[in-house]
Amino acid sequence: MKIVFGIVSSQDLLIKINFPILINQLRNKKITWKNETWVDSGGYQIALYNLKISVKDVLEKYKTYNAYAFFSLDIPSIFSPLDRKNFEYFEYLYTKMEYIERIIPVIHLYPTREVDEAIDFYSQYTDYIAFGGIIASSKLKILIYTFPWYYYIRKYVKRLHVLGMSAPYFLQIFDTANSMDTTTYTKTASYREIFWFDGTRRYVGDRKERTLTKEEEEKLFEFLDKTNFPFEYDFSNVKILKTMNAWILKYNNWNIKNKYTIYAEKLRKMGLDSLVTEIIQNYKIANELKKEKQQNKKKNSIELEE
């Protein structure tokens, strides 16, 4: 599987080691590097912050990039019906950027019939489709309910990208994907932490006691030596920490056992009928949990006002 690493600065060290990278068209003005570059439409941020950005605006920005792939503008649906404007946005970008091979549409957490409709529609144009909704679901603490959609879509789509890896165990759960993007290596480094080989983290900063033992440090350096890490081993340098985390994500052979990977193994063995049943069940449960969280949020807001 190809891991595409999200960056926000042209000074990122990943550019120097030629890793595939992802940029957001809302933040990045131009591409000044030679790395394989994927471009995100910023659809999640546009919806989250109610930004007034049209598909025409996205097109004009996309035209300024010489990139490997572009994600279509989409309106995220988190356990909710498909917004068919996504079809219009995709067709618009696809037809206006005919010289670009990869305009990748996104399928979210729709009811099964609408997932089928989206697969049929997009498959007329491309065999590369993205699966979205993971990050938003994770923030709502309902991530685990998203997994059946991935395994269902995987059975129908030739090439599949997973949008947003937030933990190493994702590499096991979605190991049959063709590609996946992530910025979690950056966030982890900002806490002065590195990924450990079992999926946990180790604090390596100097503001509190380190949780990386001397023996673990030796094991880490041995791994970095063996895989030819190209920079000095400097825990005080955040750029180095970021790159270490990206390196570990890419080159470690992950074998994590938790409730997420156990559920994924169960789904992996299911046929289509069982996956559909699981989707219907999870759609209902996730919506009930969403509603409950919204009610609690509203209640807490009222209490604060009083």
Curated annotation (Swiss-Prot):
InterPro entries in UniProt: TGT-like_sf
Coiled-coil stretches: 277-306
Native organism: Sulfolobus islandicus rod-shaped virus 1
Effect after changing residue 271 to R: In strain: Isolate variant XX
Protein name: Uncharacterized protein 306
Keywords linked to the UniProt accession: Coiled coil
GO biological process: one example: tRNA modification
Domain of life of the organism encoding this protein: Viruses
